[in-house]
Amino acid sequence: MTAVQLIVGLGNPGPEYDQTRHNAGALFVERVAESQRVNLAVDRKYFGLVGKFNHQGREVRLLIPTTYMNRSGQSVAALANFFKIKPEEILVAHDELDMPPGVAKLKQGGGHGGHNGLRDIISQLGNQNNFHRLRLGIGHPGHASLVSGYVLGRAPRSEQELLDQSIDFALDVLPEILAGDWTVAMRKLHSQKATK
């Protein structure tokens, strides 16, 4: 069981991107920080908002890159390399077009699925893709040409409530995630689905 040492939440910086679908991962890390009473502060060395807390005698770091999404790997690699955190000790939370709002799933490894944040992280980690992912469903607009505007848009309240519920489900399995008990975390999380 590989325990997590770094939790990353992907998004774009600036008020114009706050609460957009693409910032679902950043929203998750903000909620983790709240739950652990962690103050996230800008650290230019790591190109992001950074915080840490202790879990069973070891440090767990939180990171929200303040680069744009397609440069997320610069931030993740800077922090992971400095603290000698291996890819398999990293959890990256991100928005997922291929799942409906209200669904959250964990997986390890795999490709980037067209997600520019994941693409850059894989590249900056030396093409290592075996980090863990928390995929937060945001749904799909129906056509590839609509994706950019969709992910950079704010969800209607009913959809945002479903995303918030899926983040709650993920927070419920945070103890298992931190312990590296992925089988139990997946079983619990994957049986949940938000309701309107």
Swiss-Prot record:
Designated name of the protein: Peptidyl-tRNA hydrolase
Binding, tRNA: Y17, Y68, N70, N116
Gene Ontology CC annotations of this record: cytoplasm
Enzyme type, top EC level: hydrolase
Keyword terms of this UniProt record: Cytoplasm, Hydrolase, RNA-binding, tRNA-binding
InterPro entries in the record: Pept_tRNA_hydro, Pept_tRNA_hydro_CS, Pept_tRNA_hydro_sf
PROSITE patterns from the UniProt entry: PEPT_TRNA_HYDROL_1, PEPT_TRNA_HYDROL_2
PANTHER family in UniProt: PEPTIDYL-TRNA HYDROLASE
Subcellular location: Cytoplasm
EC annotation from Swiss-Prot or TrEMBL: 3.1.1.29
BP GO terms, sorted: protein quality control for misfolded or incompletely synthesized proteins; rescue of stalled ribosome
Residues under site feature: Stabilizes the basic form of H active site to accept a proton: D95
Oligomer and partners: Monomer.
Function as written in the Swiss-Prot or TrEMBL entry: Hydrolyzes ribosome-free peptidyl-tRNAs (with 1 or more amino acids incorporated), which drop off the ribosome during protein synthesis, or as a result of ribosome stalling.
Family designation: Belongs to the PTH family.
Active site annotation, chain numbering: H22 (proton acceptor)
Site (Discriminates between blocked and unblocked aminoacyl-tRNA): N12
Disulphide linkage map: none
Catalytic activity reported: an N-acyl-L-alpha-aminoacyl-tRNA + H2O = an N-acyl-L-amino acid + a tRNA + H(+)
A GO MF term: tRNA binding
